[in-house]
Structure formats: C-alpha cells, structure tokens
Amino acid sequence: VKARIPFAGILLPAFLAAASLHSQALPGGSEIQVAASATYQVAPAIASDAAGTVYTVVWQKQIADGWDIYARQYTPSGGTLAAGPEFRVNTLTAGCQQLPAVAADFNGNFVVVWQSDQDPGGGTGVYARRYNRAGTALDAAEFRVHATAAGNQARPAVAVAPDGRFLVVWQSDQPGGSQGWDILAQAYNAGGTTAGVETLVNSLTAGAQSSPRAAYLSAPTAGFAVVWESAGAVLTRRLGITGATLDAADRQVNTTATGFQRSPAVAADPSGNYAIVWESWGADGSTSRVLGRRFQGVSPLNATDLTIDASVAATQQRNPAVSSDTLGNWLVSWDSLGDDPSGAGLVARQIDNRQNPVGAKVVLNNTLTAGDQTLSGLTLTQGSRLLAVWQSLTPAADSAVIEARSGTLAGGDFYTVQPCRLLDTRNPSGPLGGPALSSGSQRVFPVVAQSLCGIPATAKALSVNVTAVGAAAVGSVNLYPGDGPALGTVVVNFSPSRSTIADNAHVLLSRDGSGNLAALATITGGGQVHLILDVNGYYQ
C-alpha cells in the first residue's frame, strides 16, 4: 500500500499472491510500505477522521492455517505519512478471517468488520471490533454481529456516524429468506451496544440480494443509505440511526435498463446527499462501463445515469469505489483495462457537486504498472484531501502488493481565517444584519460581496459555527447555496430553551459567481429566529 497526503482511496484484492502494502502521495512523494512478508497481504480497506489527521488501513494476511485481519495507522507528518506498528484485529485465530471493512467517526475512532468461517452456527459469520483513534481496542475481543444463527452471513460493510454510532450490513442466506441472499443490518450505539433489532433491509425478496455497502447520512435524514445489487439492478434503501427502515420499499438506482448492473458503492457528503456508483455490463454493446447517480433524500439530483467512463471496444471498467468531500464533490476510482501499459490499471475521475465531470480521468498507479492493479477504495477528508489504496499483481515476481496514492480535488483547497463574526441578524438591518429570519421565508445573504472576514470572491464554501437564538418555539434553519438547496443543505435545529451551535459546519456558496448563502427557517406555529454565523475558514 502506498500513500500520499492529500488524496485517499482503497482497493480490494483480485488476486492472491505473496504481497506487501505500500502508499504514495500525489503528485510526487516516496512510497511507503504498509505490510510486507512472505505470505499474502490482500484485501485492504481504509478510513480516516474528518480532518485527515489519522488514517487506518486494514487488510487480510495469510497465516499457517488460514487468514487473519491486520491493521496499521498513519499520521501526516511533514508531507509524508508516519506509520505506527501493524497489529492483529481478530483474537480468534483458527480458520479464515476475511474481507475486512473499516469506517471511522469524526475523531478517528474506528470499527472493523469482517467475515469468519468459525461461526458457531456452522456457516460463515460476521464479526466486529471497535478501536479508539490511537489504535487501542475498545472491545476485549471481536463480537458477533448477526442474531441470525442459521445459514451464511457474508461480505460485511460498515458505516459510522460522526458521534460514533454505526451500522453493519451484510448478505445472508438465512432459511426462509429470498431465493439466495437477503441484506441484513444491525445498528449500534457508540458504546457498542445494539440499537434496535436486526433488520431485513430489502423489501424485494425474489432473487438474490448481494454485495451491500452503506454510508452515514447527516440531517435531515440522520441515518444511513444502504445499496446492493439485485437481479441485474442496483437498489437502495435508507435506514434510521437505530436501523429501522425509513423508506416504504427499495428504490432502483439505475435508469439504464439493458445489460446488468453490479458492484455498487456509496458515499455521502456532510449535507446528507449521497452518490452511488456501479459497473454496468452490456448496455452499450461493449464489455462494461462505470455509471453513477446522486441523491438528496429519495430525490435523484441527476435524472438519468451519469456515464463516468464509458468502456471502449474489448475493454472492461470494473469495481468502482467512491468518496465525497465536504463540498459535495465526489471522486470515483475503478479498474480499467486499456489505461495501463500491462494488464488492468486503476483510474479515477472527479465529479463536482452539480454532477459534472471535472477534467479527464487520471491513472492512479503511475509507479508500478506491471501486472494487474485492481480493486480500489477511497477516503476524502477536510480540504478535499484523499488517499487511495489498491492491490497489484506482479506476475514475474508472483506477488501482490497494496499501493496507495494521495492528492487534492480541484477546488478543494482549505484556508483558515481568524475566527470572525460574518453575519448576525440581531444587528441593524443590512445585507448581513437584520431583520430576523421569518418562518417559511427564504433570505439570501451576499456573504462574499461584502468583503468581510478575509473571504475572497473565489470562495466556494465556508467553515462556520452556526447559532440560532431568540425563537419562541422549536424549529430549524436550513443553510444552502444561494442558487438552490439541491446542491447541499446544512440543517440546524433549535428550541426556546437553548441556542444551538453547530461546530464546524461546512456551508456551500452559490456557484453562479455571486457567492451567496441562503437561509430558510421553519418554526412550529410560525415566528422568527435570529441567525449568527462565525467563520473560521473557506474553500476555493
């Protein structure tokens, strides 16, 4: 595995061979090795805190009688990644522990999940273990996730809320389920206790439901988006923070009707919008391509599937991964035949928060190109910094390595400013002053045009503290770009008994050149509320 500081991503292994893990920054920077031995090191995954101050990489490592799950942490230090020691995650060492996944909360505390063939039920089981940001285990041993005892529980994924609550999803061939597999979920409190009961995610029970993925959705949903493949289509359903279903039924993601759709991935931004990507086979007469779609709640933000990279004759675009930054931009990576001098290579492409591709695709593996580079994964942190890791098969050496590369998304640079009060409706009437917000009435603030607090005309988003005061009833304030809430909304709830401060909220500004910010208050029974914004940084 190799890494570079502003860009993050992960790959899962397609081949089993003697492996080492490396990481490399983008552009430039030396590669670092995550793990190396004479045994196989495969199936890496990665997670980070919101600020990008600690990255956690997990993978499966071959041992004498099977596989173990290992982890290692990295902290940015002077433009490089400082590595901590690798450590084994599982305490049960018999048999095979495989297919790890990892996710972290706002501060970098993380949860690892994996599949084990040592389940007491006789089939495969799903297990988890929690750690703090320093890599200290919070559980004495792994715990069994599933309540279902019969059948096989496999291919787990995990999503973690900023406050540490988390959801584990997996596929299950429980007796009496669908024809093959169902998608199950279990929610947990931050302390590791179950929240709610084991949930059947899919409402469609005909055919096999498989390959689930999940992402945390912030307010107004305050829950999770789960995606999976089903009989040649990609489906999604939202769950609440305790795992209860929020949508009446599954929703089909893809509008492409020909061929079959598979291998979905999902990522959400801080506004609760979420991007889903997948591979599409046979729709255009060639082998495969990568498609995507973005949603706000249940509403799609692009009416039809977005072609992220159409395949060319006799090539394949496979196994997409996706991550989203604080501005709602998303980065997609995937395996590609034809973009690498030898075999499969890894490429990536940025999509902005209006669902427009930004520039051309970029080849990630520019150092090691021999053999096949496959199965990537991504994580984006504050300032649109990212880290990508993947597996590489080198036939001549009969080995597989894990590599990584880092960089920064276009328009994602973050700049701090001295904390400054930008807007206060308690002040006399003015562009950034009074009057107070009235319930149900939108107000647009020209925050850039006033040239205050060191915010330049080129700013695309602000990092702010939000305070709502003076309301006579409970309610909320929605903050969104001046040219439309569909681009991303921050929701701040308040009550008469206390003001509400949303620390380090990231609010998007309008993209029409005006740099405006809109606010809409909703108050029970009507009335008014005052809004205060203190800015501490901006993106451009």
PLM features: residue spans?
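N-terminal secretory signal peptides that target proteins for export/translocation
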Residues: 1-4
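Extracellular, repeat-based ectodomains that mediate carbohydrate processing or recognition
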Residues: 24-410
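Short edge beta-strands and adjacent beta->alpha junctions
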Residues: 409-540
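Bacterial N-terminal signal peptides
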Residues: 8-20
